[in-house]
Amino acid sequence: RGTSKGWRPWPPLMSNVRPHENQRRMSPRSVTLRLMTAHDLPMLHEWINRPHIVQWWGGERPSFQEVQEHYLPWVLGKENVTPYIGLLDGEPFAYAQSYVALGSGDGWWEDETDPGVRGMDVSIAQPELLDKGLGTSLVRALVELLFADPRVTKLQIDPAPHNLRAIRCYEKAGFRQVKQIVTPDGPAVYMLCERPSPVSSRSAA
């Protein structure tokens, strides 16, 4: 998973998911997810160096070579992270990733014993698109996609305590605050989203 939740590796999951599967639409605009490819790396490098991303992702400004070295193994399915590009009306506008929490390494989730737990991170690349409900739609789309895998038991996310925008977004998407924790990146709010209970096949009399 790496030593930072900034541009460095977070810890393949769902490598068989094809672009545009399990898409979720919001009216009147469409928010979808596709797998990230190597062709997205220059765009991702530019995104990661935008001020509002730097603010929340560790303050570092990596070179393209550094971004390529860290993200290309994920794209190629060589590590335990799956990266996605969020699309707004078909155009890239956000980055998202999921990872298997168990065995993340580097001090992350050392007490985790459930192989079905997935972590996730999201970030909107365009600051002008913040506070428009798109983050919530993106998180919901990723939640839906991940829970489509029957192996997944629950989802977790760990925003910084002062990132109130992110915390509100995740709560709207179905996450709940569990506790304050200390991660290798510092203090965080540990949030969980449980798998929805199966709908009973028996109809009410």
Predicted regions and their residues:
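Terminal substrate-recognition subdomain of acyl/acetyltransferases
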Residues: 6-10, 15-27, 171-205
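A short beta-loop-alpha structural element at the N-terminal edge
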Residues: 31-46
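Conserved GNAT-fold acetyl-CoA-binding loop/helix
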Residues: 52-72
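Acetyl-CoA-dependent GNAT
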Residues: 68-129, 145, 195-196
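Conserved acetyl-CoA pyrophosphate-binding loop and the N-cap/start of the following alpha-helix
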Residues: 133-142
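Conserved active-site alpha-helix within GNAT-family acetyltransferase domains
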Residues: 136, 161-179
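Conserved GNAT acetyl-CoA-binding A-motif
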Residues: 148-158
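Conserved beta-strand-loop-alpha-helix junction that forms the acyl-donor binding cleft
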Residues: 156-167, 183-187
